[in-house]
Amino acid sequence: VLIIAVLFLTACQLTTAETSSRGKQKHRALRSTDKDSRMTKRCTPAGDACDATTKCCIPFCNLATKKCQVPTFP
């Protein structure tokens, strides 16, 4: 009887662990998709408003005018 009880408890633990890991895997997939959507964020075109956190399509955000601009060299 004791052996049967030990086997039953072991089986319950394995089943619970398997179910829990599936739930976590779904959670990871959602997190991964969210990260991918943040990485594919579009850039702000030249002439549009920007700030220190804006990703301009061109490499420069003029914080004085708050517009995405191409840098001018003298």
UniProtKB/Swiss-Prot annotation:
Signal peptide: 1-17
Region (Disordered): 19-40
GO cellular component entries: extracellular region
Record-linked InterPro entries: Conotoxin (IPR004214)
Disulfide bonds: C43-C57, C50-C61, C56-C68
Annotated localization: Secreted
Tissue: Expressed by the venom duct.
Keyword annotations from UniProtKB, A to Z: Cleavage on pair of basic residues, Disulfide bond, Knottin, Secreted, Signal, Toxin
Propeptide regions on this chain: 18-40
Pfam families noted in UniProt: Conotoxin (PF02950)
Top-level taxon in the UniProt lineage: Eukaryota
Main location: secreted
A Gene Ontology molecular function term of the record: ion channel inhibitor activity
Family assignment from sequence similarity: Belongs to the conotoxin O1 superfamily.
Domains: entry comment: The presence of a 'disulfide through disulfide knot' structurally defines this protein as a knottin. The cysteine framework is VI/VII (C-C-CC-C-C).
Protein name per the record: Conotoxin AbVIH
Native species: Conus abbreviatus (Abbreviated cone)
